[in-house]
């Protein structure tokens, strides 16, 4: 329990339960999951993580994402807790730049995470999810937690309203041409309202994130205003 870890001059202390990260049974948390292929090509993606108990999580994966392929290939992942909206945004809109990555025992993680844990797959169930990617075929994956570390200098706190607006907009972005293909105009109107809220109460990173999301959608859909 007293084991300490230093990554890029940031101090972490070891913990033994997910509750140490303020993650509790039955709750879903927005995280950044880092993985790597067997060829050591790293990837980061926003993934909702459900806390099953003190040492197990459940995640839903779709076949179209690198994260899914990597996890199914080698069964390893790190779940990173961060409040940085740009990390969520960049890892959704494209590939995360190298500067955002650190390493834990040779495995990619996110620099400056508030906390993180390594996990490995113990159970996989194929499941059809209506209106999702790849004709709805994906996997529900249960993972056992191996190592939990918490930053010494940061308290893990709930996300604010502007950050929640960024997360919600990223969900809409990912599903815009699939689940929401028949109601895109309505979703776009709602996203513009989320942007209004973010511009009013958000910090500069949150505001920039919203601009990136909306600009990318407008680039891909010329009819949006």
Q: Predicted regions span which residues?
A:
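Basic, polyanion-binding surface patches
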Residues: 2-116, 122-225
């Amino acid at each position: 329990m007293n084991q300490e870890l230093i990554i890029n001059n940031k101090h972490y202390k070891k913990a033994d339960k997910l509750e140490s990260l303020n993650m509790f049974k039955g709750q879903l948390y927005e995280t950044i999951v880092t993985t790597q292929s067997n060829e050591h090509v790293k990837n980061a993606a926003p993934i909702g993580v459900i806390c099953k108990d003190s040492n197990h999580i459940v995640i839903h994966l779709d076949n179209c994402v690198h994260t899914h392929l990597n996890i199914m290939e080698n069964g390893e992942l790190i779940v990173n807790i961060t409040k940085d909206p740009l990390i969520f945004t960049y890892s959704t809109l494209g590939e995360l730049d190298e500067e955002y990555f650190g390493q834990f025992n040779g495995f990619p993680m996110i620099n400056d995470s508030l906390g993180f844990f390594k996990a490995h797959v113990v159970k996989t169930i194929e499941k059809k999810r209506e209106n999702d990617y790849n004709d709805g075929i994906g996997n529900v994956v249960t993972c056992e937690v191996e190592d939990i570390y918490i930053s010494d200098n940061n308290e893990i706190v709930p996300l604010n309203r502007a950050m929640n607006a960024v997360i919600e907009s990223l969900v809409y972005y990912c599903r815009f041409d699939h689940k929401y293909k028949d109601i895109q105009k309505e979703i776009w109107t709602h996203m513009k309202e989320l942007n209004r809220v973010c511009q009013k109460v958000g910090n500069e990173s949150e505001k920039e994130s919203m601009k990136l999301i909306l600009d990318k959608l407008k680039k891909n859909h010329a009819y949006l205003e």
